[in-house]
Amino acid sequence: MLISKIKFSYIFFICYFLLGLLIYSDYGIGIEEHFQRQNGFYWLKKILTFLRFDDLNFLALEKYNAIRSYDPSLPDSEFFNFYGIAFDTPAAFLELIFKFNESKLYFEVRHLLNFFYFFISAIFFYLILKRRFKYKIIIYFGSIFYITNPRIFGDSFHNNKDVFFLSILTICIFFLFKYFEKKKLKNIVLFCFFAAIATSSRIMGLYLPILLLIFIFIDYLSKKILIKDFLKQISLILFFFILSLYLHYPYIWKLNFFEFISWFKAFFYHMNLRILFFGDYYHIKYLPRLYLPTWISITIPIYILMLLIIGYILIFKRIFQRTANIRPHVQTYNDLWRSTNEKKDLFIFVSLTSFMIFAIFLNTAMLSGWRHFYFLHNFIIYIAVYTLNLIILYFKKKKN
C-alpha cells in the first residue's frame, strides 16, 4: 500500500541512481583525465594561495608537482588555464580533503562525481518536460531517451568536460524556462549562476544569456513589454551573469576589456591533428560538412532520429508561417510565439539550428566523434518528445 503511494518518478530516478552506483567503477580512464586532474590542482593551489590556507596549499602544490613529474608530457595548465574550474577544482578538493592517494580510487571518485552531475541534470530535464508537456508517458519516455542514449550514457561516467557541460546546460535551461513563465528575480539569479558555470566550462555557454537577451528584445519589439521593463530585465541579466562569472572564474580576472577579442582566442586553440573519416584523413579544423550530422545520426537510436527530423520540420513550418504572416501595425496573432510553450520550443529550435550551422559552416575543430557537441543532446531529445506529444494529440483528436 505504501509503495503504491510513492510517485513513480521517485522510483524511476532511485533505480537509475542505484544503477549508476553499481557500474560507475567499470569505466576506464579517458585520454584527457590526467590533464584534467592536474588542472584541478592548478586552480586549487591558486585559490588556496589567494585565501591564504597555507597548509592545504602546500598539499595541493605537492599533488600538482607529483602529477607533473609523473607525466611531464601533459599540457601545461598555465597555457590551458581557461577551463576546468567548475568540475576539476572541486574534484581536486575532494581528493585532497579525503586523502585519496590511490590512482584507482581518485579516478573512480571523479567518475562518480561526473555521474552525479548527469543524474541531477536528468532530474532537471524531467522537470523541463513536465512543465512543457502534460502526458506523463511521454515525459518518462523523454527522460529515458535522455539517459539511455548509448554514447551519452557511457560518457556520463567518465567524460568530465562534455557531459558535464551538457549537465550544467540542462539545469540552466530549466531556470531559463522558469524565467519565461515568471519574471522573478530568483529565476534570473539562478539562470545567470548556471549560465556562468556553463560558460566557464565551455565558451559556448555564452550563447545562453545572449539568446535570452535576443528573446527579450523580440518581446519588446512585439510590444509585449514596456521599455522600462526591457531595460530592467537586460540590466539584471547582464549584472548577475557577469558577477557570477567573475566570482568563480579566475581566468577573467586578468581580462582587459580593450583586448576583449584576443581574450577569446585561447578558446579556439586546436591541436595539429588529422582524423580518419570515411576512408580519408582530414585536419580537425577542416572537416567535411557532413562530419557532425553523420556522427550524430549513427550514434543516436534511429527512432530518436526519426522523431527529431519530424519535430524539427514541424517547428520550422510553424516558425516560417508565423514569420510570413507578420504584418506591421497589427497586434493580433502577430508574433513568433503565442504561448510560453511555443516560446520554449522556439528557443530549443534556434539553439539546435544555430549550433549546427556554426559547426557545419564555420570550420569548427572537432575530434572523437561529436563529443564537443554533446550538449545538443538536450535539444535533440526535447524535439523528439515534442513529436511524441503531437502524435498523442493527433490520435486523441482522431478518436474523438
Describe each PLM feature range:
Residues 1-20, 120-123, 130-131, 136, ...:
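Start-transfer (signal-anchor) and selected internal transmembrane alpha helices
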Residues 7-14, 120, 125-148, 181, ...:
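Transmembrane-helix signature of polytopic, membrane-embedded enzymes
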Residues 22, 142, 175, 187-202, ...:
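Membrane-interface alpha helices of multi-pass inner-membrane proteins
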Residues 31, 110-120, 140-148, 152-171, ...:
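Multi-pass, polyprenyl lipid-linked donor-dependent membrane glycosyltransferases
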Residues 46-50, 64, 79-89, 98-102, ...:
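Transmembrane-lumen/periplasm boundary regions of multi-pass, lipid-linked membrane glycan transferases
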Residues 108, 112-133, 171, 175, ...:
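Transmembrane-helix motifs of polytopic, lipid-linked glycan transferases
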Residues 133, 172-188, 198, 222:
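Membrane-interface transmembrane helices that cradle and orient dolichyl/undecaprenyl
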Residues 162-166, 198-201, 207, 298-302, ...:
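Hydrophobic/aromatic-rich transmembrane helices and adjacent perimembrane loops
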